[in-house]
């Protein structure tokens, strides 16, 4: 009797542990959009430019369409609580994210988002701060102070798959501290350059107590899906109906 009881307790514990451990992998994915450049481009632009650039007019159309279709932006904090702790989400939640620190994300995108009370997640590449075409320190502070989330996109956009052990301080630890000192808030979220990741990167991010890390549209890690949260890159050639799908 005692042996059966003990085995039952062990089985129940393992079942609960396994369920909690794998929970994020079985969650319905929240749509997450990823923008880079927001500017006009010519029909002769390179495929890369077209893939990572959205015109201001198209971006405005997309924000309006999201609002008209009932979408509500959520913070990565809310996404984390949903994935890890089963916290409820509002109807039609969405995250709007931005990579690379581009100045027009502040000067153009935020103005459009403000019309609909949308908040975004801005992943900052710290080497670019204050350079021509990129956000200033003050603009990043304003984003944080007005309800947007600041995340880390490494120091100089080198893919994490190329790092040696010595690179992590340069690319992850110091830039994170720089951003935290700038905004006076924890920086708990990370975006992989080029969407590329490996197991070593996941181990490092976990060791540094990041909550979530974001990729693009590649496959998630089965063991730690919260460190490979997928996003949809919005190409400049997409129509607004395509973006909504």
Predicted features by range, described:
Residues 133-140, 167-171:
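Charged helix-capping and loop-helix junction motifs
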């Amino acid at each position: 009797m005692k042996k059966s009881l003990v085995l039952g307790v062990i089985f129940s514990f393992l079942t609960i542990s396994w369920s909690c451990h794998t929970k994020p992998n079985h969650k319905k994915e929240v749509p997450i959009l990823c923008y880079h450049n927001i500017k006009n481009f010519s029909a002769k632009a390179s495929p890369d430019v077209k893939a990572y650039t959205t015109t201001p007019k198209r971006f405005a159309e997309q924000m309006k369409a999201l609002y008209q279709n009932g979408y509500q932006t959520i913070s990565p904090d809310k996404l984390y609580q949903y994935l890890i702790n089963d916290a409820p989400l509002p109807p039609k939640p969405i995250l709007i994210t931005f990579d690379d620190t581009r100045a027009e994300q502040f000067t153009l995108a935020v103005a459009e988002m403000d019309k609909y009370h949308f908040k975004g997640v801005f992943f900052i590449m710290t080497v670019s701060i204050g350079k021509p075409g990129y956000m200033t320190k003050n603009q990043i502070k304003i984003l944080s102070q007005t309800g947007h989330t600041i995340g880390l996109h490494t120091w100089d956009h080198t893919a994490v798959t190329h790092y040696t052990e010595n690179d992590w301080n340069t690319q992850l630890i110091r830039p994170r501290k720089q951003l935290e000192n700038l905004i006076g808030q924890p920086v708990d979220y990370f975006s992989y350059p080029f969407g590329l990741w490996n197991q070593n990167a996941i181990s490092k991010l976990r060791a540094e107590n990041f909550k979530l890390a974001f990729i693009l549209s590649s496959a998630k890690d089965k063991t730690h899906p919260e460190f490979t949260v997928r996003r949809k890159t919005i190409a400049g050639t997409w129509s607004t109906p395509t973006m909504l799908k």
